[in-house]
Amino acid sequence: MAATDNAAEQVAHIAEKIRAGKTTLGIEFGSTRIKAVLIDDNFQTIASGDYSWASHLEDGLWSYTTEEIWGGLQSAYAPMANDVETAYGEKLTHVGHIGFSAMMHGYLAFDEAGELLVPFRTWQNTNTSEAHKKLSELFQYNIPERWSIAHLYQAVLNKEEHVSKVAYFTTLAGYVHWKLTGKKVLGVGDASGMFPIDPTTHTYETAFIEKFDALPEVAAQPWKLENLLPEPLVAGTPAGELTEEGAKLLDPSGALKPGIVLAPPEGDAGTGMVATNSVRVRTGNVSAGTSIFAMVVLEHKLKALHPEVDLVTTPAGDLAGMSHANNFTSDLNAWVGLFGQFAKAIGQPVDAGMLYGTLFRAAIADDVDANCGGLLNYPFRSGEFLAGLPEGRPLFARSPEANMTLGNFMRAQLFSAFSPVKIGMDVMTKQERVQVDSLVGHGGIFATPKVAQKILAAAFNTPIKVMSTAAEGGAWGMAVLANYLWNTNEDHSNLADFLDGCVFKDAQSTTEKPVASDVVGFEDFFARFTKGLPIEHAAIETINLEDK
């Protein structure tokens, strides 16, 4: 009876918080899922909703339609709001603050009337190699292929008809925020994936803007770059209010009222840093999903230009080095799905948790070979700059004498998933001697205890911490950033202290240290992985991208 009373009291307590607006909502657009998370003022998730989606090829480029964006947003919000009403008896009419986050980079370009000029070009597209090379050389600063400025400049170089009409361009998070508030702003972390940010002023690098505008093909355009970019805002800055039109876009039922103050819209790198408490200098995180990035907050700028390392900022505006790989779980999920089909075919269907857990644990069983027994896998569904691949073809290969076991197979899947991101991380830690006090892993792959954590420790030869919030991901991190609007000081300089002292003060974590034999095994696998990349090039030449 006491337990029932306590549960009822807890529900009543949370219902009161919902009525009082002591909640914040974070919504993140990932590559395969849009997730909405509502948290209370103790940073606990009290309701959530999600919607699955996938990019598609449009004229040879990866894209999502605006109908998919808005339909997906509403389809993630609705079950969260329903969750609130079902669990706590409250119709969700208001929340304290809202924040939107999304996969970074890409290209959403609009004319003066606010009309989309070309289909959304996502970060997955690697058709911007010429722009990447020319801008990196011009700035002496790495401009990756997926950055928004590379997409704009490539369109200029291609003499695309829409370029002269561009009045504004932004990221996915910036687009959603703009349509819901009317404000053309962007969190500084997301902005740093559009165009380089000065970590001192937290604005765009003016010298680079001047160099860009001076390029003859750019000077011929009717616009100046600074007039096209969203305004960067550091975490804790109010970023506009939900308009009446915006409220209806988010919640077509009309229950949600306008006037809610929004946080600056951020990128998935920034929300990953927040979700892992990795915004302080010499800390880092590995955010793993459809793509993967490893990030370290830097003490100072890197000594040299490294194409393998992106320089972005934390949501507070501090410089961070990032190794980003386009490909991570897509190929892995396809193989796991195949095993799931087999289980169903023999009349023994298993749920996703058991399926992934069983297969993942096989990868670290006592009888596996540390180097995967001669098995080799390439997880490239799309192009991969780090590996020099313009397109992707998932591949599995082995020598005739390889030790083909389930454990070795799954180990090869996981090793290969972490291999592309290792390329850039090795540049930072081995060439630039970047010091890392801690690395925290987050994302759904870490939900199975120890497995991905242990393999990542071997890949980077460094201890990997996973926190109790590991599977919360970016939507929760965005909700925390929205909560920070209540806690910030005037100069917004204490995000790291806020996370340490408020959000993560009681957080539980586990740490896996690298095992010497695993490190040696990974390095052996990685050497074969690198040596075998010509196999991937041959596949690109001989297998059509859209073959079915």
Role assignments for model-derived ranges:
Residues N6-R19, L25-G26, K133-L186, F195-A219, ...:
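Active-site core segments that coordinate phosphate-bearing ligands/cofactors
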Residues A47, L57-E58, G106, A113-P119, ...:
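Glycine-rich, flexible loop/turn motifs
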Residues A20, G30-R33, H94, S101-M103, ...:
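Short, basic and Ser/Thr-rich N-terminal targeting/leader segments
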Residues N125:
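Carbohydrate-associated surface elements
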Residues T128:
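Gly/Ser-rich phosphate-binding catalytic loop and adjacent alpha/beta segment
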Residues W223:
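ATP-dependent phospho-/nucleotidyl transfer catalytic cores
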Residues M1-V118, K134, K165, E226, ...:
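N-terminal glycine/serine-rich phosphate-binding loop of ATP-dependent small-molecule kinases
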Residues E85-T122, P144, H177-G189, G193-D198, ...:
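Short beta-strand-loop/turn "lid" adjacent to the catalytic site in phosphate-handling enzymes
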